[in-house]
Design a protein with these regions (language model features):
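Structural signature of transmembrane alpha-helices in multi-pass secondary transporters
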Residues: 10-18, 127, 131, 213-217
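C-terminal transmembrane helical hairpin of 12-TM major facilitator-type secondary transporters
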Residues: 125-131, 137, 142-196
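Flexible cytoplasmic inter-helical loops of multi-pass small-molecule transporters
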Residues: 56-74
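A late C-terminal transmembrane helix in Major Facilitator Superfamily
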Residues: 18, 187, 200-217
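Intracellular juxtamembrane helix-capping segments at the cytosolic ends
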Residues: 1, 7, 188-201
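Juxtamembrane helix-start elements in MFS-like secondary transporters
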Residues: 7, 115-124, 171, 175, ...
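Extracytoplasmic gate region of multi-pass secondary transporters
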Residues: 80-140
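Helix-loop-helix hairpin linking two adjacent transmembrane segments in secondary transporters
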Residues: 9-60
Length: 217
C-alpha cells in the first residue's frame, strides 16, 4: 500500500509540470518564438537529468519486500503466460490511446469548433492540474480497495467524459469541465496498474515488468 501511494505522489508531482507547460508554451511561442521556448524546455530537461543522477537506490538491507530467485527470463516468461498481465498490457494500450488522442487532437478540435487557442491551452493545463488530485486519490483508494475495480472505473469514466465532450455544445465552460474531469482520470491509472503488477509478480522485476506495460502505452 505504501508503494502504491508513493507512485501516486510521483505521478501527481509530474502532473504539476504538465499543468504549467501549456500555459508557458502558449505565451512563450506568441511572445518570443519557438527558439526561446525550446531553449527553456531544454534547461528544464537538463535539470531533471541532473536530479535523476542523485536518486539513490535502496540497499538490500533496506528492502522490506521478499524477492524470488527467478531469473529475468523466467519472470518474463511467467508474465506473458499470465492472463491478467496480458490484460493489463492491453488496457494500458487503450490508456495511451486516450491520452494521445486528447493531447494531439483536442486543441485543434476546440479551435475548429470556434473556440480560441487559449482555451485549448487551458484544457491541457486543467488536465495537468486535476490529475494531481486524481492520481493522489487513485493511490489512496488503490491501497484500500480492489485495484482492478479502480482501474475499470477509471477507463469507463474516461469514455463517458469523451462522449459527453463531443456531444455537448462547444463553449469555454464545457471545454473547462472536460479538462477538469478528464484530467482527474488522466494518469490515475498508474498507481493501480503498478500495484497490480507488484501484487502478481513481486518487486524484484517490477521495473522491467511495469516498463513493458508502460511501453504499450
Amino acid at each position: 500500500s505504501t508503494r502504491t501511494i508513493a507512485m501516486s505522489i510521483v505521478t501527481a508531482l509530474g502532473s504539476f509540470g504538465y499543468f504549467l507547460s501549456p500555459i508557458f508554451t502558449n505565451y512563450s511561442l506568441k511572445e518570443y518564438g519557438w527558439n526561446y521556448t525550446l531553449f527553456i524546455f531544454s534547461l528544464v530537461l537538463i535539470t531533471g537529468l541532473v536530479a535523476a543522477y542523485f536518486v539513490r537506490s535502496p540497499s538490500e538491507s533496506e528492502s522490506v519486500e521478499k524477492t524470488t530467485d527467478q531469473s529475468f527470463k523466467e519472470a518474463l516468461t511467467e508474465a506473458f503466460k499470465t492472463k491478467s498481465y496480458i490484460l493489463l498490457v492491453s488496457g494500458f494500450f487503450v490508456c495511451g490511446f486516450h491520452i494521445t488522442l486528447v493531447g494531439t487532437h483536442v486543441p485543434k478540435y476546440v479551435i475548429d469548433r470556434g473556440l480560441e487557442d487559449w482555451t485549448a491551452a487551458a484544457i491541457l493545463s486543467l488536465i495537468g492540474l486535476f490529475n494531481i488530485f486524481g492520481s493522489l486519490l487513485s493511490g489512496y483508494l488503490s491501497a484500500k480497495m480492489s485495484k482492478k475495480i479502480i482501474l475499470s472505473a477509471i477507463y469507463f469514466l474516461r469514455g463517458i467524459s469523451i462522449i459527453l465532450f463531443i456531444f455537448t455544445p462547444a463553449s469555454n465552460i464545457s471545454a473547462f469541465l472536460f479538462g477538469a474531469s478528464f484530467g482527474f482520470l488522466w494518469l490515475s491509472t498508474v498507481p493501480a496498474t503498478s500495484g497490480i503488477v507488484a501484487h502478481l509478480f513481486g518487486t524484484k522485476y517490477l521495473g522491467m515488468l511495469y516498463g513493458i506495460v508502460f511501453l504499450s502505452h
